[in-house]
Structures are given as C-alpha cells and as structure tokens.
Amino acid sequence: MNSSLQISKKRKFVADGVFHAELNELFTREFNKDEGYSGVELKTSPGLTEIIIRASKTQAVVGPNARRIQELCSLVQKRFNFKEGTVVLFAEKILNRGLCAVAQAESLKLKLLAGLPVRKACYAIVHQIMTRGAKGCEVIVSGKLRAQRAKSMKFRDGYMIKSGQPSKDFIDFACRHVLLRQGTLGVKVAIMLPYDETRKIHGACNIPQPDVVVIRDA
C-alpha cells in the first residue's frame, strides 16, 4: 500500500513538472519581448488551477478588455484537457526586474539572440543586477561560443553563498537555453538577494542570514 502511494506521489510530481515546463514553453512562444515575460507560477487546489503569469508589462498580457488573457485561458483548457471553468489566469507585475533571476535570464537570452557579443551582454546583465541592490550575482554561459569546442564563461560580482539553507533562502536562480546558428547555449543566472526586514525593497529576502551579527546601541 505504501509503495503504491509512493509511486503515485512520484508520478504526480513528474506530471506537475512536465505541465509547468509545457506551460512555460507555451507562454515563452506566445509572448515576445514587449510583454517582458519572466516565468509562470502554479497554484493547484481541488477543482481549481490558478496560473500566475509574471511579466513586467501586465497590461500587454491581459490585453484590451481582458480579451487576450481569456483567449489564453481557453487555449490552456483545451490543450491540457481541463474542464471549463477550472483554470484561472492572472498577470503579476514584476516591480524589480534587477532582483528577478528569471527576468534577467530572459533579458540575456534576448540580447544573445539579437547578436550581441557574449561578454558585452553578460557584463550588462551583471551591472543591471548589482545596481538594483543585489549583494552578488553570477552569470554562466556555456556552449559553442566562438570556436568549435564548447566551453563555459563565468561572470561574477559581489558576495555569493554556495551551500546550506541560506543558499536556498537568498539565491534566486534561473536557467534558460538559447538556440543560435552555431548551436545551443546554456544560460544560468544566480542572484544573491539583499536582506530587508522592512520589506520595502521589492524582491528582497526578509530572512536574516545566520552568520550576520547586528550590534544595536542600548
């Protein structure tokens, strides 16, 4: 009984992951750079599936009189065999793109597709991330960059945590693939989020680092 339950849980996790990947691929093809698409989030409950589309220009995602998002909702219901009325789409605005790894990975992808040199594109992304208040960042581009042999280029700045629970709390990570004429490039963006207990900085982490000591005057 326990083994069958475990298998069903594994199948559910795999099915959810495949559904998320297919949704992300669908929206990536549907939206161009004008909407600033930066990923999708799923919230499932019995009888209802909420799909949150993250973008920098939500008005372009919704469309006039919410027509575009309604068409997308019906498209998702038909393509993934959902019953009518069981899927709801929302558009969420990204207020601080500099601290969103998905947004920066998509921006780097568009720069590379436009023919910008890898070093120039990556340094522009690193500069944009650090000027928005990040404590550190790392951009990795791997694949056939110039020569026939594949290689990896890393661009770092600031302070980065690589292991432990703080790496899960403070690091925002995104991975994308760029199809170019010479081959496919892999793009990885990792951002070390700043700590903000007042929650005034959009995209910052409100969990204090365990190794940081704050001295307050009595």
Swiss-Prot record:
Gene3D superfamilies, sorted: 3.30.300.20, Ribosomal protein S3, C-terminal domain
Every KH type-2 domain range: 23-95
CC terms in the record's Gene Ontology section: cytosolic small ribosomal subunit; extracellular matrix; nucleus; phagocytic vesicle
UniProtKB keywords: Acetylation, Ribonucleoprotein, Ribosomal protein, RNA-binding
Residues where N-acetylmethionine is found: M1
Any GO BP: translation
Organism superkingdom: Eukaryota
GO terms of molecular function: RNA binding; structural constituent of ribosome
Family recorded in the similarity comment: Belongs to the universal ribosomal protein uS3 family.
Protein's UniProt name: Small ribosomal subunit protein uS3
